[in-house]
Amino acid sequence: YQTSSPGSNITIGPL
């Protein structure tokens, strides 16, 4: 699961 935020990139969960 991948989420993108303004100014930051964060990856959550198994790839």
UniProtKB/Swiss-Prot annotation:
Superkingdom of the source species: Eukaryota
GO biological process, alphabetically ordered: proteolysis
Keywords annotated in UniProt: Aspartyl protease, Hydrolase, Protease, Secreted
Keyword Transmembrane: no
Keyword flag Cell membrane: no
Subcellular location(s) per record: Secreted, Extracellular space
Expressing tissues: Expressed in placenta, specifically the fetal cotyledonary tissue (FCT) (at protein level).
Gene Ontology molecular function, alphabetical: aspartic-type endopeptidase activity
Sequence similarity: Belongs to the peptidase A1 family.
Descriptive protein name: Pregnancy-associated glycoprotein 56B
